[in-house]
């Protein structure tokens, strides 16, 4: 008998450790739009914490915030898309990004910690263990980790590819119970209709999924690839419209919005398994294969 979405409602409600991924588009619109989004996000995460849940936030947006900062400078400086320019923008914008989050989370008495890392950090002998230990300690202290790839030093050859894959890797490292990806659409669409439930990710699904439509590097394709990876590990993934009010809270309470990708296995991913995924998926080595 095939599983149905409703059969996972209890698993979703009882998820103890939740990774939430926010894309660049949610943080690069008009100031009023960004503020409205952050008010909703912070309120929902505060609600999760009050329920006793552990939350890790994976956030893009450093380069987008860097471009905004550059545009505000009283000069004629402009930026393109060269590697050096994107690295410099990330260096400028990451500080702004974390300060923005801190200003909102402090209003609900949540302390945050910035975690920046890259492919080479995880491939080093002690890097994986140190990162896992850092996550564990922060969560035990009740601190909210805010995670991003260290784009100021990452090159195209040694990048995770996008933060959808980064959020999946973080989910494996921290042994999460649920990944929530916030995007700008209502979920995975077929013929302009939301697909509410995917038992598994097929090649047809990937063929219908599009690339980035905003300032980010991912798209629905990378979201489905990441969800497919976590499905093997028994971790469900929800793809939700981050523009909707209290979308995280509504999903957990009702399990009736967005696209839910079901867990299909219970594979335990070892440190070496995660490192192999990184080697296969980083930009300079095979692109999108899993």
From Swiss-Prot:
UniProt-listed CDD domains: AAK_G5K_ProB
Q: What class of enzyme is it?
A: transferase
Gene Ontology MF terms in the entry: ATP binding; glutamate 5-kinase activity
The residues that the entry says bind substrate are: 60, 151, 163
Keyword terms of this UniProt record: Amino-acid biosynthesis, ATP-binding, Cytoplasm, Kinase, Nucleotide-binding, Proline biosynthesis, Transferase
Question: What InterPro entries does the record point to?
Answer: AceGlu_kinase-like_sf (IPR036393), Asp/Glu/Uridylate_kinase (IPR001048), G5K_ProB (IPR041739), Glu/AcGlu_kinase (IPR001057), Glu_5kinase (IPR011529), Glu_5kinase/COase_Synthase (IPR005715), Glutamate_5-kinase_CS (IPR019797)
Q: Which Gene3D superfamilies match?
A: Acetylglutamate kinase-like
**Gene Ontology BP terms:** L-proline biosynthetic process; proline biosynthetic process
Q: What pathway annotation does it carry? A: Amino-acid biosynthesis; L-proline biosynthesis; L-glutamate 5-semialdehyde from L-glutamate: step 1/2
* Nucleotide-binding in keyword set: yes
- Using the UniProt record, give the first listed, main subcellular location: cytoplasm
The entry marks the following residues as binding ATP, namely 21, 217-223
Briefly state the protein's biological role.
Answer: Catalyzes the transfer of a phosphate group to glutamate to form L-glutamate 5-phosphate.
- Family to which the UniProt record says this protein belongs: Belongs to the glutamate 5-kinase family.
Q: What is this protein called?
A: Glutamate 5-kinase
Organism expressing this protein natively: Leptospira interrogans serogroup Icterohaemorrhagiae serovar Lai (strain 56601)
